[in-house]
Amino acid sequence: KLRSKIEIKDLSSSHAVGVISKDKFEEIQEELGSKEKTVLYRESPCFVDTRLSSLGARILSSLEKLHLTIKKLNLKIIDKSNYLKLSHKEGIPIEGVMSLQNSLFGLESNFEELKAIDFKKGCYVGQENTARMKLKNKLRRRLLPVTSNKPLNISDEIKFNDQVVGKVLIGGQYPFALI
């Protein structure tokens, strides 16, 4: 419903979000006897990553119950770089995305592939431009993960046969470029 009154609370000081594998989420579903994509496990919402199932699921837990949730689910805490490497391989930028705000169209950011844009329903910011780009097949650039044998920084040019074909928009260990 448009213009519904909602309240958004910052729970970051009392809750944590964890990433779990798709297999672990399916175990939780089986334990609960549910096939829903969002389930409640011991008062903790757990939901599939709607962008790509290979990115697993999220579980939201209060900090008070976090240790117990980790223990009950037999989870292992792993280094964040494992998840960042997977998301980079899948073409999903995680870090550095705030610098992209207001600089790309949704289609350039792969929103259609990530199911963030549905051309059968409407009403979102930039709908007219996005629909026109889709209709006229005018998508010329796309945000893609890139790799290099040397470090890539924001604004570095991507060249092919000595011609500039793109520009790095997210630098660091897991860079993305608009190509």
Which residues fall in each region the model found?
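A short beta-strand-loop-alpha-helix capping motif that often carries His-Thr
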Residues: 85-88, 121, 136-141
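The conserved catalytic core of RNA pseudouridine synthases
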Residues: 42-61, 102-122
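Acidic, low-complexity central loop/insert segments
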Residues: 1-90, 159-160
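Short, conserved active-site entrance elements at the starts or edges of catalytic domains
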Residues: 80-81, 85-111
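Glycine-rich, small/acidic residue-mixed loop/short-helix segments
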Residues: 107-117, 127, 131-179
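Residues that cap or initiate secondary-structure elements
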Residues: 24, 65, 94, 139, ...
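Conserved active-site beta-strand-loop modules that form the wall/rim of enzyme catalytic pockets
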Residues: 57, 85, 96, 120-122, ...
